[in-house]
């Protein structure tokens, strides 16, 4: 849309002329804030109900306005929200359509309210919904992780540090590590939700209002725990959006790490997993290719989500109290991050649930890289009463010898081992299998299969999949 127009009927009384084409274009937020229409209708209905209850508007006008808002909502649901840049945003778009439907009574809706507290309320409601959706999606991802971990509580694979073979672990233990990460993500969203669940509605432009409103009534109607306590802070606060983005960014990092592992595991040199066809793509030139594109996009999306957080932090860093138009730019990064996060959660949930783990390849890989070297050192500590640092040195010598011969530790003869340290005897071989290694890691939170099964059982109770014994 371009060109000049008449002065805006919502605020144009003190202007001699209308905004220029560039002003209309830079000022319009309806292309993106139309996403708030459900929240805007809900907040307006709560507001007009309160106005009627307080006698600020007549009961007849309050009922007429509420009915009209329902009509507007039905139109939006059926046909979408129209984009008229002259009306700037979702608030004025809705009020304008309401006036067309019910006449002058629509003008009473904005009594004791400003767009400043209106948008702060709408946006909080939207972010609260986004937090709830993220929490639900993450719970489903946890369900998938716990289910697969239970299947593979005893499936042995190499554990890595620096992407080098470190110690044998079980696949179930590895998957439960992500269960823990995702649990922390859920708690971050839950914590943020508690902090943000106060209603700014009724703060008006910045100083409150002289009308005898009941902010507790509107807060309760909208599911808030109560009203905010400072009108200046209420209209200028975007901490709730930043809290959401911080939680989303941290969550996206965890999803990216999980995606990266699936990408590595699906590569031919590893061959630990076959990804579902439904979450993979092919090559336009190489017929044999099966690319982990969904996982790669999850990994890429994490960068964009972190960028959304950075964008809003920079927008907010130097704003004086109270409202500034810069804050109109608060919504696009939140909307983008929420969309990307939802896609990423869904993709990784499907990947975990449908992946085919090649446990034979994992088991074979666990035999490589002298993964049971620590078990030899631990055996020396327990059986020969050797200080760990000395045992570490002895084990290093054994690894060096085995490596020079191209064999595994348990393929060294007892004579070879005794030549390194005469305190070693045949009992050591029982400690050098990968099965013995994982079984020995039975400390709380360890990789021993029984310990993994215990953690899985506790997780199933926590997720509501079964009752506590």
From Swiss-Prot:
The gene that this protein is the product of is argH
CDD domains in the record, alphabetically? Argininosuccinate_lyase (cd01359)
Q: What is this protein called?
A: Argininosuccinate lyase
Q: Which domain of life is it from?
A: Bacteria
Q: Which reaction does it catalyse?
A: 2-(N(omega)-L-arginino)succinate = fumarate + L-arginine
**Entry EC no(s):** 4.3.2.1
Q: Which HAMAP family match?
A: Arg_succ_lyase
Q: In which pathway does it act?
A: Amino-acid biosynthesis; L-arginine biosynthesis; L-arginine from L-ornithine and carbamoyl phosphate: step 3/3
Q: Which organism is it from?
A: Novosphingobium aromaticivorans (strain ATCC 700278 / DSM 12444 / CCUG 56034 / CIP 105152 / NBRC 16084 / F199)
Naming one, the record's GO cellular component terms include: cytosol
Which NCBIfam families has this protein been placed in?
argH
Q: What class of enzyme is it?
A: lyase
Protein family (similarity comment): Belongs to the lyase 1 family. Argininosuccinate lyase subfamily.
Which keywords accompany this UniProt record? Amino-acid biosynthesis, Arginine biosynthesis, Cytoplasm, Lyase
Q: Where in the cell is it found?
A: Cytoplasm
Q: Answer whether the UniProt record assigns the keyword Cytoplasm to this protein.
A: yes
PROSITE patterns documented for this protein: FUMARATE_LYASES (PS00163)
Q: Which GO terms describe its molecular function?
A: argininosuccinate lyase activity
Example of a GO biological process term: L-arginine biosynthetic process
Q: Does the keyword Cytoplasm apply?
A: yes
Q: Which InterPro entries match?
A: Arg_succ_lyase_C, Argininosuccinate_lyase, Fumarase/histidase_N, Fumarate_lyase_CS, Fumarate_lyase_fam, Fumarate_lyase_N, L-Aspartase-like
């Amino acid at each position: 849309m371009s060109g000049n127009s008449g002065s805006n009927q919502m605020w144009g009384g003190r202007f001699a002329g209308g905004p220029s084409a560039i002003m209309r274009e830079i000022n319009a937020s309806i292309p993106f804030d139309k996403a708030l229409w459900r929240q805007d209708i809900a907040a307006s209905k709560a507001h007009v109900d309160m106005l009627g209850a307080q006698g600020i508007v007549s009961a007849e006008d309050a009922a007429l306005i509420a009915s009209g808002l329902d009509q507007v909502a039905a139109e939006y649901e059926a046909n979408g929200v129209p984009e008229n840049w002259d009306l700037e945003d979702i608030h004025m778009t809705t009020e304008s359509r309401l006036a067309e439907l019910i006449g002058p009574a629509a003008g009473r809706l904005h009594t004791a309210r400003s767009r400043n507290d209106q948008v702060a309320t709408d946006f909080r409601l939207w972010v609260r919904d986004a937090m709830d959706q993220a929490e639900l999606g993450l719970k489903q991802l946890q369900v998938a992780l716990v289910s697969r971990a239970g299947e593979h509580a005893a499936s042995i694979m190499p554990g890595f540090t620096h992407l080098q073979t470190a110690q044998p672990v079980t696949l179930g233990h590895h998957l439960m590590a992500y269960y823990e990460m995702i649990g922390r993500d859920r708690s971050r969203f839950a914590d943020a939700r508690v902090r943000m669940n106060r209603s700014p509605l009724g703060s008006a432009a910045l100083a409150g209002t002289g009308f005898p409103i009941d902010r507790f009534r509107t807060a309760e109607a909208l599911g808030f725990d109560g009203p905010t306590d400072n009108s200046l802070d209420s209209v200028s606060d975007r901490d709730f959006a930043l809290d959401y983005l911080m939680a989303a960014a941290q969550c996206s990092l965890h999803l990216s790490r999980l995606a990266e592992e699936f990408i590595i595991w699906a590569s031919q040199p590893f061959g630990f997993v076959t990804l579902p066809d439904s979450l993979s793509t092919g090559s336009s030139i190489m017929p044999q290719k099966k690319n982990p594109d969904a996982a790669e996009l999850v990994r890429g999306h994490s960068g964009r989500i972190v960028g959304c957080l950075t964008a809003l932090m920079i927008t907010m860093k130097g704003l004086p109290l109270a409202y500034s138009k810069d804050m109109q730019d608060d919504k696009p990064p939140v909307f983008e991050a929420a969309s990307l996060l939802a896609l990423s959660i869904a993709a990784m949930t499907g990947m975990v649930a449908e992946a085919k783990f090649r446990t034979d390849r994992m088991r074979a890989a666990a035999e490589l890289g002298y993964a049971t070297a620590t078990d030899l050192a631990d055996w020396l500590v327990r059986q020969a009463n050797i200080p760990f640092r000395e045992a570490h040195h002895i084990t290093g010598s054994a690894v060096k010898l085995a490596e020079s011969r191209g064999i595994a530790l348990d393929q060294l003869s007892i004579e070879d081992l005794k030549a390194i340290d005469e305190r070693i005897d045949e009992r050591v071989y029982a400690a050098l299998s990968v099965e013995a290694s994982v079984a020995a890691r039975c400390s709380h939170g360890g990789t021993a299969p029984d310990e993994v099964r215990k953690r899985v059982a506790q997780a199933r109770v926590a997720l509501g999949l079964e009752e506590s014994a």
